[in-house]
């Protein structure tokens, strides 16, 4: 069923409804209309990294870990797995007339906001700090969820599920202020940073839904903004439905004070495109109609949009997806995809040669509050796994499988929690200031040839306002330090005289300076999924090479002093594109057990077909005048040939292409990501790859928000990390570079 057919059916159905019935369908928990054969439907469903809050499901790595894979194909496969499980659960529950919250097919994922500030608690729900990476992964996630990508193939008449790009448009903290805050962003920052991922999801992913944010953007509430709707529907041609974040419309009159009462909020939201209200304010739709402040046409329009989505999902027809059985939930294919994702997501930040751990090691100490923590596996917005494997359990299982448990071959794994995640003591009755697990931790270290220290955060310390235990910051972080209890533990363990491997499990940048100075190795494991501990163990012992790359910059804590205030949405000194200091670990960085190098073996200027104009992006703030472009309208991009060679062990790695504009004063100061590809090379293997960089990669954005190709000379960099002195210092390798004129 195409959209035109779905719209026609929706109009015919809505035409049969009474005014009260139409109004009732605009709430997230839409009631049944039995006389028309319409069952109840709840629009609120979550699928950030697996079907969430709906019982058993495959729990994939948290979104920030999925971003660290730099793997578009696996991202789409994971989203397809999620959609399959969503359909399986929907099929089973619908037959039992269970149509409650979290049990539908409209998934409010992905989160394509930009992780602009490392303090933001919800940053681990995103794909990191780079607009290009976020765009590419967001598009593939949308296609996977909706069944419209390469994995699903062509010819499917219905959506497998409906994705939702959120939170439109300028939203990344502070969490404590989100219900009242006005995010002020310049046209340049909007077009260059905050809008591209949404634009890509709409224009390339054909995303079925977009969610408006809680905050205001440049003075207008995001769920009642004429300017944002003009960009979304007018400039980009969005045709799906628009949903408010939960209780965001109530914020209009209670916190933003742009209206004075619920009926006025209903009017502002509906007239400006918010079709479904997650919250209670649309219970006043009939009041607004009776008062004469709202035209029925807006109610009808939104109702038709919502039923268009339901028809596209096949909710009133028989579809091929009806046959998906419940046995698809946590099936072998999905668990395998989760395992591959966990392996690809782990980032090796340092290795003095201790990794992989030698088979001759017979005593291993595992220490730390996240070593045996299930919470540290799953992040937020998660489902429930039928089995969890913590880091400790993964290590125990791996050595048992490799060595057995008998005779001289036995490997002893000692364990100590070491400290609480953030409290001073583990036991409530321990003496204040005693740090009651430190002595045990040091004893374990003394007994061990190698120590694995597992630290970090979990969803109780970084997350969404109202959902975390970190109430003093409403989910955001005050700084980039580990909790004091963990810093004390780390200091003691790093000085224990044994080689220490630090595993940090967090969804954001943590200042690991102490570990960088003294640890033998460091792994950034994110929140790796329900069974991720098994995959971390595979990396520790060399069954798999680490190959993840940082989707965010890792700063030192003092770097926060140079950044704008958290409430300042200017991009100055934020992210790798504008940060002027020296990061602890740069965006795009990550070591492997291999030794991969890249050379640029050729470039080719691409031209568009006769009569076609290359897509550089119209831009939310208008198109460039022909005189602003430094190239002809037929310029379609650059094809770059890269020869990659691995002089070490077999490994995956990620080819990264960066472009620097050498002429335009509007360009970002340094090179920015323009292409990437995950590759696999055996030991000693050499292969050549071709990567096409679109014309948009050569654009810059001026202060008016106009995107154009203003320069003719560019430098293209190719390698396995971001170009720059810090990357070279950490990896011992530099990117290949070539200057071109387009």
Task: Tell where the protein language model's regions lie, with residue ranges.
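Glycoside hydrolase catalytic-domain context in secreted enzymes
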Residues: 1-609, 616-617, 621-627, 632-704, ...
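Structured interaction patches on ligand/partner-binding surfaces of diverse proteins
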Residues: 733-736
């Amino acid at each position: 069923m195409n959209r035109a057919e779905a719209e026609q059916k929706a109009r015919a159905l809505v035409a049969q409804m009474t005014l009260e019935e139409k109004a009732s369908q605009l709430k997230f928990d839409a009631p049944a209309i039995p006389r028309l054969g319409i069952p109840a439907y709840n629009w609120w469903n979550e699928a950030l990294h697996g079907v969430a809050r709906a019982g058993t499901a495959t729990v994939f790595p948290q979104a920030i870990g999925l971003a660290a894979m730099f793997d578009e194909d696996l991202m789409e496969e994971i989203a397809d797995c999620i959609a399959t499980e969503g359909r399986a659960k929907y099929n089973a529950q619908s037959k039992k007339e269970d149509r409650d919250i979290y049990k539908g097919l409209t998934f409010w994922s992905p989160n394509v906001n930009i992780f602009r500030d490392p303090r933001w608690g919800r940053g681990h729900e995103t794909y990191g700090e780079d607009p290009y990476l976020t765009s590419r992964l967001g598009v593939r996630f949308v296609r996977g969820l909706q069944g419209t990508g390469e994995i699903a193939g062509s010819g499917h008449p219905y959506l497998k599920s409906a994705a939702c790009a959120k939170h439109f448009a300028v939203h990344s903290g502070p969490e404590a202020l989100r219900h009242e805050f006005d995010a002020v962003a310049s046209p340049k920052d909007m077009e260059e940073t905050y809008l591209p991922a949404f634009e890509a999801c709409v224009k390339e992913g054909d995303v079925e839904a977009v969610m408006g944010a809680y905050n205001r953007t440049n003075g207008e509430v995001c769920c009642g903004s004429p300017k944002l709707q003009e960009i979304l529907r007018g400039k980009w041609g969005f045709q799906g439905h628009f949903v408010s974040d939960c209780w965001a419309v109530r914020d209009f009159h209670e916190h933003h004070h742009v209206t004075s009462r619920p009926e006025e909020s209903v009017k502002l939201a509906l007239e400006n495109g918010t079709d479904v209200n997650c919250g209670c304010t649309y219970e006043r739709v009939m009041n607004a109609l009776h008062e004469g402040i709202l035209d029925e046409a807006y109610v009808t329009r939104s109702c038709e949009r919502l039923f268009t989505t339901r028809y596209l999902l096949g909710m009133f027809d028989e579809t091929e997806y009806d046959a998906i059985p419940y046995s698809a939930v946590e099936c072998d294919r999905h668990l395998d995809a989760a395992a591959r994702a966990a392996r690809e997501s782990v980032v090796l930040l340092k290795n003095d040669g201790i990794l992989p751990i030698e088979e001759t090691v017979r005593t291993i100490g595992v220490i730390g509050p996240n070593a045996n923590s299930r919470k540290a596996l799953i992040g937020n917005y998660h489902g429930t796994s039928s089995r969890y494997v913590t880091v400790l359990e993964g290590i125990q299982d791996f050595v048992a499988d490799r060595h057995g448990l008998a005779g001289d071959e036995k490997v002893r794994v000692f364990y100590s929690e070491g400290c609480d995640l953030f409290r001073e003591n583990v036991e409530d009755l321990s003496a204040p200031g005693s740090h009651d697990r430190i002595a045990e931790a040091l004893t374990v270290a003394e007994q061990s040839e190698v120590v694995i220290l597992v630290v970090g955060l979990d969803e109780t310390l970084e997350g969404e306002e109202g959902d975390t235990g970190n109430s003093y910051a409403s989910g955001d972080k005050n700084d980039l330090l580990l909790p004091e209890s963990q810093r004390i533990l780390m200091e003691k363990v790093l000085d224990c005289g044994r080689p220490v491997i630090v595993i940090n499990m967090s969804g954001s940048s943590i200042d690991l300076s102490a570990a960088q100075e003294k640890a033998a190795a460091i792994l950034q494991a994110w929140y790796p999924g329900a069974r991720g501990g098994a995959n971390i163990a595979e990396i520790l012992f060399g069954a798999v090479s680490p190959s993840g790359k940082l989707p965010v910059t890792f700063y030192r804590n003092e770097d926060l002093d140079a950044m704008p205030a958290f409430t300042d949405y200017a991009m100055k000194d934020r992210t790798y594109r504008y940060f002027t200091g020296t990061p602890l670990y740069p965006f795009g960085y990550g070591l492997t057990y291999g030794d991969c190098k890249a050379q640029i073996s050729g470039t080719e200027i691409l031209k568009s077909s006769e009569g076609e104009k290359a897509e550089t992006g119209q831009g939310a703030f208008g198109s460039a005048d022909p005189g602003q472009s430094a190239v002809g309208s037929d310029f379609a991009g650059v094809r770059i040939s890269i020869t990659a060679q691995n002089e070490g062990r077999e490994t995956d790695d990620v080819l990264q292409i960066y472009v620097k504009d050498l002429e335009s004063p509007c360009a970002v100061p340094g090179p920015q990501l323009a292409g990437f590809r995950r590759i696999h090379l055996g030991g000693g293997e050499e292969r050549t790859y071709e990567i096409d960089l679109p014309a948009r990669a050569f654009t810059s954005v001026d202060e008016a928000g106009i995107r154009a190709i203003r320069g003719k000379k560019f430098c293209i960099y190719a390698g396995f990390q971001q170009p720059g002195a810090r990357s070279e210092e950490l990896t011992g390798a530099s990117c290949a570079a070539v200057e071109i004129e387009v």
